[in-house]
């Protein structure tokens, strides 16, 4: 999977290590020297998410005091990890679909589009197939992001991974604390 440019959808319960898998795919890919940009799609309001993903120009809205590059542009040449994509509002899904299909983004408040070269890895703990059926997730976007679906089993079913994950967490915390 890492050697391809295919869009990947990571499926699994909260806490299964989906971000760790996404980082691993990125680090083993030809895009490893490019940025790995994470966006939690469920943590932001719709308007903030749009600005976060696509950027905005000065004056686009009340608090837009300066131009801001979006996460898609920041990930150019690398990978964007769209965590909790199942939480994204339908109106934002349309905008994301356009970015995925056209390989370009438009900053909020701008008429100009910018070409992007990013690999997309998305993750969810929801059953997106069911979400498509009940109308809370777009069918066309689902098929665009699930080119390579990977199910990550819960940690309780793969206890042999616990020491590896614990080492990673300790190393990560230690480097953040400069120890």
Predicted regions mapped to residue ranges:
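ABC-type ATPase nucleotide-binding domain
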Residues: 23, 144, 148
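Conserved Sensor-2/SRH helix of P-loop NTPases
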Residues: 162, 166, 170
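Conserved AAA+ ATPase "SRH/arginine-finger" region at the nucleotide-binding site
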Residues: 40, 148-161
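Charged helix-capping and loop-helix junction motifs
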Residues: 134-137
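AAA+ ATPase active-site-proximal loops
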Residues: 1-115, 120-126, 131, 155, ...
């Amino acid at each position: 999977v890492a050697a391809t440019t295919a869009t990947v959808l990571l499926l699994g319960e909260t806490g299964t290590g989906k971000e760790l898998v996404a980082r691993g795919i990125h680090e083993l890919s030809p895009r490893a020297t490019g940025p790995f940009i994470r966006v939690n799609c469920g943590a932001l309001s719709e308007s903030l998410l749009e600005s976060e993903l696509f950027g905005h120009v000065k004056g686009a809205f009340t608090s837009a005091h300066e131009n801001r590059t979006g996460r898609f542009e920041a990930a150019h040449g690398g990978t964007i990890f769209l965590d909790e994509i199942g939480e994204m509002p339908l109106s934002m899904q349309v905008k994301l679909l356009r970015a995925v299909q056209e390989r370009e983004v438009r900053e909020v408040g701008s008429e100009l589009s910018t070409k992007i070269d990013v690999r997309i890895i998305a993750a969810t703990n929801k059953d997106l197939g069911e979400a498509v059926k009940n109308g809370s997730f777009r069918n066309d976007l689902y098929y665009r992001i699930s080119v390579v679906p990977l199910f990550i089993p819960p940690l309780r079913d793969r206890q042999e991974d616990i020491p590896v994950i614990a080492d990673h967490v300790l190393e990560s915390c230690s480097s953040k604390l400069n120890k």
